[in-house]
Amino acid sequence: MTMTPQHPGMPDEQRSVEEHMALSSLFTTLEDLTAWSRKHSLWPFNFGLSCCYVEQVTVLTPVYDQARFGAEVIRASPRQADLLVVSGTVFHKMAAPLLRLYEQMRAPRWVIAMGACACSGGMYDIYSVVQGVDRFIPVDVYIPGCPPRPEAVLDALIMLQQQVGSERRPLGVTVGNTAGLGFDAPRRRDQRRDERMAQTLLDPPESL
């Protein structure tokens, strides 16, 4: 909240302490101030695995200028970052290193899944590809596309900033059981896997 002086034209010597504070101070809550500072100072850590990362790097160019949103400083270490951007195809061999990097990030932390492969496995419905990065880490914003355009990345960043600005997180966050948050829910593509695989079983020539 802010304090509005009742007599803006009054001489300084006639103003009360409250009047002086209203002219030079802004009052707010610690939670709002913390959320505002986090919103305008995201520290991203990019985890690029495939062609989507090319579009993600394009956002850093002067044409799109990601620096306008306070997220231009790419961190080289997850210990210095609070935003993890996963772009590209996540193979099962990469799941464990990616989870380790996520666990090294300081809380609070956020995750953006960029591209169809990071969101749901994309067209790689095979044994070696994780069908969505949210299988092992929570995702805050999904960016569909193969690959997404740079404008979509900026839209996702703005959407995440709105979410961060409205959160009321303390300075430290303890994540409890996530069983009820839908991370372990069965995927529709997994439920229909047998049905789709049956379509590849053709009738033998002698039956025609």
UniProtKB/Swiss-Prot annotation:
Keywords in alphabetical order, please: 4Fe-4S, Cell inner membrane, Cell membrane, Iron, Iron-sulfur, Membrane, Metal-binding, NAD, Quinone, Translocase, Transport, Ubiquinone
Enzyme class, one word?
translocase
On the tree of life, the source organism's domain of life is Bacteria
Bias class Basic and acidic residues marks the residues at 185-197
InterPro entries assigned: NADH_UbQ_OxRdtase-like_20kDa, NADH_UQ_OxRdtase_20Kd_su
GO function terms (MF aspect): 4 iron, 4 sulfur cluster binding; iron ion binding; NADH dehydrogenase (ubiquinone) activity; NADH:ubiquinone reductase (non-electrogenic) activity; quinone binding
Q: What is its EC number?
A: 7.1.1.-
Report quaternary structure and partners.
NDH-1 is composed of 14 different subunits. Subunits NuoB, C, D, E, F, and G constitute the peripheral sector of the complex.
The molecule here is called NADH-quinone oxidoreductase subunit B 2
